[in-house]
């Protein structure tokens, strides 16, 4: 549904926001009642784009507006529950030899290993969102492996792999994406954009 709402051919003005922005908006609105101006600032979108985004969510009956601001409807809460069921730990990741930016953010996507091809799709999505790049790991037989070769993390980086596993606590066939950027915001948005590729 979120992908359809973000498509340019949807009814109404051509949106200048993405499926990722819609997902983030639902997460934000699900955590607090929020007004348009504050939501605009949180999303990093202009006032016009935020107004259109809110209109699309209203038309889809995913949110409603009260005196306290935007809040999720039952349908909106259902979508948020689906997102939470697919996404696991989200965390700032320390700079290391495997990271690709001064700031790094990781996210776990549950049970999505079979959707990973080469990892390039995730990297490209992260870059389009403003990150420098992204590194993707999948969990196979209890170990972190790196596509496309599915080879184990090099021995010299085993301590890093161990720290990642302790931080994200992945299960078999989970995916961990770590995006790096020139700011925490770009790193987080890159990781989320890469994760969305696996949920489309």
Placement of each model-derived feature along the sequence:
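Long, charged amphipathic helices and adjacent flexible linkers at domain junctions
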Residues: 87-101
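Basic, amphipathic "hinge/linker" alpha-helix immediately C-terminal to the N-terminal HTH DNA-binding motif
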Residues: 68-81
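A short acidic, leucine-rich amphipathic alpha-helix
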Residues: 38-43
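Short amphipathic alpha-helical interaction segments
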Residues: 44-58
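Short amphipathic alpha-helical interface segments
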Residues: 19-34
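Short alpha-helical segments that sit at the start of domains
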Residues: 1-23
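A short, conserved structural fragment
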Residues: 58-68
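Mid-protein regulatory/catalytic core that forms ligand/cofactor-binding pockets
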Residues: 98-198
